[in-house]
Amino acid sequence: MRARAIGRAFGALLLCCGLLAGCAKQPEQERQPPGRVDAAQHDAFFLWAGVKAPEVLAKARTIYLLDGEVRAGSPARFVPLRPAVPHVRHAEIWLVVRLERLDWKEPVWRRVLADLDRWQAAGNRLAGLQLDFDARTRGLDRYAAFLAEARRRLPRRYKLSITGLMDWSAGGDPAALAALGSVVDDVVLQTYQGRRTVPGYEAYLRSLARLPFPYRLGLVEGGAWRAPPALARDPHFRGYVVFLLPR
């Protein structure tokens, strides 16, 4: 009996040690670095002008192509960055204009609309126009007014897309967000700055449910990323777009 009691006690001790060891390892597992964005696992991409098209684009379903910029310098004018009209047959494409100002003059509007028509006439499956602008959260009402003007000028055959900031969901005025969402068809919220994922992006993701419109998340190729479980359950979440980096 005594031997059995000693055996049971020794077994209990081993079990306790095993549990303690498991508990000790858990924080180490939680500290593991997040995953990295693998472009090969996605089918929607940003391709900036001057970036050589990688092989991953062969399986793309959606491609956002930078056409030009409207820069902050005076006067406001369109600066073309793509030397030729693209010819893409296997994927839907968006014509992207990067803008640093909202006071567009008539020549700018005419040039952008003419480029849209040229891209469509070349046989592309052109979804529409994407405006890439870092609108500050406190200025969303002004941006919404600009987007309403863009929607008014765009022929109905073209959709309107915008990029946005994750901070919109945390601090954006509800009325301004609703006005913005009423005129756009596609929103891509950027989770990166430059070539890196924004530090602490997880905190922003927790407030995405406040957004009153569907959205996608823009990820930078090779950047840190770990999707929270709640994201897949958000009815407004429409997937990812990967920003491809120069090779």
Model-identified regions with their sequence ranges:
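Secreted glycan hydrolases and related glycan-binding modules that recognize and/or cleave
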Residues: 11, 22-247
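Sec-dependent bacterial lipoprotein signal peptides
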Residues: 1-21
